[in-house]
């Protein structure tokens, strides 16, 4: 928070997750928690409680489908697909069966039992150091509230039904909240909690509603009716803005509108530097419908297809045929551009209960997951590999293995892949004769041994999010030490150069698929280090493309030489920003 005693203007800083600037009166939405009273029931009442539960699930499913339809009609099926995760919750047989069992054993009312079971599911996901899985926890919480309201005979909450335009301030917003709000009267959104990857943030961007999250206890500091200016680009919520501030933001908004218009013109252009070097610019996706954004933003295919969603919130593992159909359809839509599929990066604790025997881990993020889990559960691994190989018949599929720590793991993974190829050949099932295989470099040991791994694969893809986290021993979602998560740390740059040099020494291409690839301030650094491909969130592709088109490889290499003489992350970042500002300063404003 910052303020000026003379003007009484007060600024609160959060994370801007949906661009745009809005000004208006605040409406503070207080959380309406559903109080669930616990009471005993007789064994003879269990059947009635089950009937109530089933009715509430049906009502909830219908409400979700109605919201999904409204979103599909107003902003498109891609965003409406967000509610598929909600439907999975109300159809989750594992969760439902546990509720039914506890009804019979605990002999308590179904509201209490359902809340207890669903809350435990959500809390388990919330403890995981993964924004995607934490978002699934919010989905469960959202659906839980809706089911309980239906069990209690209450109508859906209407606190978002504003009668005049306001800036909405809330503790948190679920996808249901965002989909249900009266968009004509919501100028902008600010919340205590949330992240850029939250479904509410995604919907806000699609609805073109400026939004800020992570303002901590902003709901306790503001009152309905206060005048605020919301900057969804840089994350500032300004209370009682001065005329000077209002005028400054009007000018900023005008400039940004011009930049946005220019970026749209780049959709059909290639990401080629001023001196003629082509940098492959791909997009990261999680769901099949994300391909819409890949196409809309002019990306050259998919540099990272996270396949984890196929395994989450379901009572059984996905079959080979189910996976094949999904991968094939995505590949066909992306063709002729490449589709790089990462084998699933989860631990056994995220799969359907009873699928594998697992033990509690103190630190699952450093534990039994990704390729480590796959190599101990060959049947699950081979099912996915066979599906990917079958989809490779489309002609543009590549595969990469996550969390490789050394040569033995990589060779074992490739051996399993070769077994799957032989099985498909024996069954005379179509697949690509030549399939490119890559290793994700996201563990320091793999970075240091990149020259040992390179001869075994066709490309290297650097997962900078985890590589930085592991190299610096920093939990990037821990607010107390998040400032130590520094992509420009001298050690990180040396690891990146080590990887790029190893790849090129063996005539491989090397890419970056972490958040660094979408940071336009760091694009000159990555090009100077020798990266051949950058894969970022689709929405960032036009900005990265413009950055690439504004640079030359020699000046980027010179930048790297200079940064290797600097001692701190802040000094290196300042030098990167200097070049970025010189070449495309309008994008940084």
Say what each PLM segment does.
Residues 260-589:
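Conserved alpha/beta-domain cores
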Residues 1-333, 339-346, 373, 377, ...:
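Non-catalytic, soluble scaffold/interaction modules
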């Amino acid at each position: 928070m910052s303020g000026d005693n003379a003007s009484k203007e007060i600024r609160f800083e959060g994370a801007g997750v949906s661009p745009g600037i809005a000004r208006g009166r605040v409406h503070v939405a207080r959380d309406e928690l559903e109080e669930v009273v616990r009471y005993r029931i007789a064994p003879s009442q269990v059947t009635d409680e089950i009937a109530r539960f089933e009715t509430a699930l049906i009502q909830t499913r219908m409400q979700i489908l109605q919201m999904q339809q409204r979103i599909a009609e107003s902003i498109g099926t891609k965003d409406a697909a967000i509610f598929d995760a909600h439907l999975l919750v109300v159809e989750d047989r594992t969760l439902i069966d546990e509720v039914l069992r506890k009804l019979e054993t605990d002999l308590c009312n179904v509201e209490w039992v359902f809340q207890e079971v669903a809350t435990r599911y959500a809390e388990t996901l919330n403890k995981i150091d993964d924004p995607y899985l934490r978002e699934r926890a919010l989905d469960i919480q959202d659906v839980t509230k809706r089911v309980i309201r239906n069990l209690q005979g209450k109508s859906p909450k209407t606190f978002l039904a504003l009668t005049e335009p306001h800036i909405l301030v809330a503790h948190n917003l679920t996808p249901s909240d965002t989909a249900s709000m009266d968009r004509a009267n919501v100028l902008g959104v600010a919340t205590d909690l949330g992240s850029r990857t939250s479904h509410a943030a995604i919907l806000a961007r699609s609805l073109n509603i400026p939004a800020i999250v992570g303002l901590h206890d902003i709901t306790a500091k503001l009152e309905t009716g206060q005048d605020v200016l919301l900057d969804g680009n840089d994350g500032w919520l300004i209370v009682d803005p001065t005329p000077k501030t209002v005028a400054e933001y009007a000018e900023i908004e005008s400039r940004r509108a011009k930049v946005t218009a220019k970026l749209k013109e780049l959709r059909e252009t290639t990401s080629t530097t001023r001196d003629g070097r082509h940098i492959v610019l791909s997009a990261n996706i999680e769901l099949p419908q994300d391909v819409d954004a890949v196409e809309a933003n002019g990306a050259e295919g998919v540099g990272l297809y996270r396949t984890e969603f196929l395994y989450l919130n379901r009572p059984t593992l996905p079959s080979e045929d189910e996976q094949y159909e999904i991968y094939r359809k995505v590949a066909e839509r992306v063709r002729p551009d490449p589709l790089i599929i990462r084998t699933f990066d989860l631990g056994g604790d995220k799969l359907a209960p009873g699928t594998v025997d697992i033990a509690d881990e103190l630190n699952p993020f450093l534990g039994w997951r990704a390729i480590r889990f796959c190599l101990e559960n060959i049947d699950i691994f081979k099912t996915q590999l066979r599906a990917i190989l079958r989809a490779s018949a489309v002609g543009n599929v590549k595969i990469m293995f996550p969390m490789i720590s050394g040569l033995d793991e990589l060779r074992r993974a490739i051996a399993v892949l070769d077994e799957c190829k032989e099985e498909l050949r024996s069954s005379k099932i179509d697949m690509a004769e030549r399939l490119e295989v890559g290793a994700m470099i996201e563990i320091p040991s793999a970075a240091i041994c990149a020259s040992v791994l390179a001869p075994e694969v066709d490309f290297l893809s650097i997962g900078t999010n985890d590589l930085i986290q592991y190299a610096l021993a920093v939990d990037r979602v821990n607010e107390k030490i998040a400032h130590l998560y520094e992509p420009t740390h001298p050690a990180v740059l040396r690891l990146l150069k080590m990887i790029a040099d190893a790849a090129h020494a063996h005539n491989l291409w090397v890419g970056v698929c972490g958040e660094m690839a979408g940071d336009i301030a760091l694009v000159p650094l990555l090009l100077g280090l020798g990266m051949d491909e950058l894969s970022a969130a689709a929405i960032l592709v036009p900005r990265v493309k413009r950055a690439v088109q504004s640079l030359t490889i020699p000046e980027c290499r010179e930048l790297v030489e200079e940064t290797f003489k600097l001692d701190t992350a802040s000094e290196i970042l300042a030098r990167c920003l200097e070049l970025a500002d010189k070449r495309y300063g309008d994008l940084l404003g």
